[in-house]
Amino acid sequence: MISINIVGEVDSILIESILELDRRITINSSNIDPNFIIVYEKFDEYYTFLKEFIGKIPIVIITGNTSYSRKCYFYSLGIDLYIIKNNESKSLILCRILNEIKKYIKYVNDDFIDFENHQFVFNNYLVNLSNIELKILRCLYINLGRYVSKEELKKGVWDTEDFVDSNTINVYIHRLRDSLKNCKEIEIINERKLGYKILIRKDLC
């Protein structure tokens, strides 16, 4: 799942165009943490909100604030795209936003898991994994943006809830994290009682 949040002005044409890009995309879901944020602002009303997410996930700002120093400041923080509304047409703004989303989708496609050769490939980073580790990785990926419980992993990886205890899952998650430790763009986090979640960070591998 690719969760995109649109903050501020909501453009129906933009929403339709985004949803056409990939069937996995959801917009403004209350159940999934965002993987990508688009902010429409008049001047500076989302400054605090933006600082919380910049550098963690891709962010696009479309603003009426014409300050060049502010634009430079946000790029220095790691913003992905900063568009001043008055400088560009609506159609061009739409194209630029969609192109940025396409770049992100490229990072989260299924192609990085090669079951036949037991390999994981991401941004030129390659590691050999066991079949179980690959299945866990894929199970976390297809649920991108939300926690996957141990019960879900048992069903998705082992196709059973029997004969697989929590310790077995913990061991495989530990091995998977250890195998991926050199790829800083991929992180597996866990939350007590919720399960495990995969984070894909941009431009770090």
Swiss-Prot record:
Source domain of life: Bacteria
Gene3D superfamilies: Winged helix-like DNA-binding domain superfamily/Winged helix DNA-binding domain (1.10.10.10)
GO molecular function, one term: DNA binding
Keywords attached to this entry: DNA-binding, Plasmid, Transcription, Transcription regulation
GO biological process: phosphorelay signal transduction system; regulation of DNA-templated transcription
Keyword Iron-sulfur: no
Annotation: DNA-binding region: 103-200
Pfam families the UniProt entry points to: Trans_reg_C
Annotated InterPro entries: OmpR/PhoB-type_DNA-bd (IPR001867), Sig_transdc_resp-reg_C-effctor (IPR016032), WH-like_DNA-bd_sf (IPR036388)
Family that this chain belongs to: To the C-terminus of E.coli phosphate regulon transcriptional regulatory protein PhoB.
Protein name: Putative epidermin response regulator
Species assigned in the record: Staphylococcus epidermidis
